[in-house]
């Protein structure tokens, strides 16, 4: 059997009608949202050509905090979201649905 035919234990159980406990599904959703936010920060920072240290200076944070945010290791608060949006010169859009989450930074147009 080659690797393309392997299935994760979770996939096999799902195929047999097993479903994860609600707590596991909720935790998985939280991880997906944290990863979506981390990716949005990273992508916008790269679009602006900023280093983590430069973004940290703009946001009044430490480089280590930016690293934790981009590594999905920080729980963002509303003040942190505001600081990052301002530092990234963008509006932050978060769409929460039952089957997906989307986090994007939209560049502010020059006025």
Q: Residue spans of the language-model regions?
A:
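Helix-turn-helix DNA-binding elements, focusing on the entry/boundary residues of the two helices
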Residues: 41, 52, 63, 78-81
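Short, conserved catalytic or interaction motifs in soluble domains
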Residues: 71, 96
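DNA major-groove recognition helix of helix-turn-helix/homeodomain DNA-binding modules
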Residues: 60, 79-95
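Membrane-proximal amphipathic alpha-helices
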Residues: 68, 75-77, 83
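The alpha-helix within a helix-turn-helix
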Residues: 45, 56, 85
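Flexible coil/turn residues that form the inter-helical turn or adjacent wing/linker of helix-turn-helix
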Residues: 37, 48, 77
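Short alpha-helical DNA-recognition segment
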Residues: 49-68
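N-terminal flexible/basic segments that precede or flank functional cores
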Residues: 1-39, 102-111
């Amino acid at each position: 059997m080659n690797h393309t035919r392997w299935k994760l234990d979770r996939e096999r159980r799902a195929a047999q009608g097993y479903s994860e406990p609600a707590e596991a599904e909720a935790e998985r959703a939280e991880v997906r949202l944290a990863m979506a936010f981390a990716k949005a920060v990273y992508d916008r920072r790269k679009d602006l050509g900023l280093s983590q240290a430069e973004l940290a200076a703009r946001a009044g944070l430490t480089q280590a905090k930016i690293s934790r945010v981009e590594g999905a290791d920080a729980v963002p608060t509303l003040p942190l979201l505001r600081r990052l949006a301002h530092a990234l010169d963008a509006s932050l859009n978060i769409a929460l649905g039952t089957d997906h989450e989307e986090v994007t930074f939209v560049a502010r147009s020059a006025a």
